[in-house]
Amino acid sequence: VGSEMCIRDRDGRNYIVYGNDEIWITELNEDLTAPKKDGLHRLLVSDHKNPELGYEGSHIQKINGYYYIFLVHSLRDRWMRTEACFYSDSLEGEFTGGDVLCDDRGYCGQGVAQGGIVDTPDGKWYAMLFQDSGAVGRIPILLPVTWKDHFPVFGQNGHVPEEIEVHSTRPGYIYQPLVGSDDFCNGLLPRWQFNHDPDPRYYHLDASQGTYTITTREVCTELTQAVNTLTQRMSYPSCAAEVTVDASALKEGDVAGLCALQSCYAAVGITKHHGKYEVLMLDKKEDGILDMTERTVVESHQMDFRLEADFCNMKDEARCYYRVNKGDWLPIGTVHKLYFKLDHFTGCRFGLFCYAAEETGGSACFRDFKYYDVDEIS
């Protein structure tokens, strides 16, 4: 258990560093498929019987003749993720060191930790770590690193600074945002990711019409089984999304709409029930129970859906809305509690979905996806 990292030394020998509580190093064979016979195998450091979290998340780097191992663990007296570093001038020698950063940035006791360090062309060093932030997931944290007696010093006065200045190697270059709106007129933008392996036979992107269409491939028992669900990561501290759905080609029992995707998901959608269209909220509880709340018959097969999420200080709540014919937004269902759990082990995401509950071959057409960050939510 725990993550691992490989390193190839300058003499061509290969090693893997791994473990949880106890961190081990094992020499590998030339093709990295097995331990090397009679190769190096030893315990490097131990945080044995830590009641919260022992050392894990190994990153090993060789810098200026020294080997550095960066690890995460928790303080023993309470849950507080903490970054540790140990170093040695030999893989067979003693590794010394300890904690190098214990700071939650004033946020809910969630320590910044786990990662490694990188240098820039101008000789500056930075650590790339992350902070658990509740249902929105893990947020990357960049902080400066300096050196004292060959040992890294993280942050400023033991803390993550609120702001740092970095020099770009591509001045003037315009970076595309990681999330944002899409009219589907320019192909699938890099900001989108499929929930799991997509099946191109069952989705269609029509750039001329600005539509993304999902056709159901198989009968599903719930949303997380749906194929070709298209997702974007949600943003801290709050965000919202809207999309227009044409449900005219749904088959009986199909459900299509907009979701806050995780194992305990919330979704607002449209279904076909006894030949009539109904809007509904899907409410997947922490205990695994799925509720379909507040089903409302509507006359139109085209609907706008909106989902708002509030992650501030780990509030972790989602709210669903719908509207007909561009009228007022109407709330549907209850305020939904979101979670960051090990079963999905990822931050919450907006998702466009369509799945079949009774028979396959139905489809839903999505257009005009709009993404709002905290400054744009009214």
Model-derived features with residue positions:
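Conserved beta-propeller blade signature
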Residues: 14-18, 68-70, 125-128
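Extracellular glycan-recognition regions
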Residues: 143, 150-378
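Residue-level detector of Asp-centered blade-edge/turn motifs that repeat once per structural unit
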Residues: 9-12, 62-65, 119-122
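Repeat-solenoid scaffold signature
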Residues: 103-151
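Blade-edge beta-strand/turn elements of extracellular beta-propeller
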Residues: 1, 27-53, 86-107, 150, ...
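Short, small-residue-biased leader/transition segments that mark boundaries at the very start
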Residues: 2-6
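Loop/turn-rich, solvent-exposed surfaces of beta-rich toroidal or solenoidal domains
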Residues: 52-96
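Structural motif
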Residues: 22-29, 78-86, 136-142, 315-319
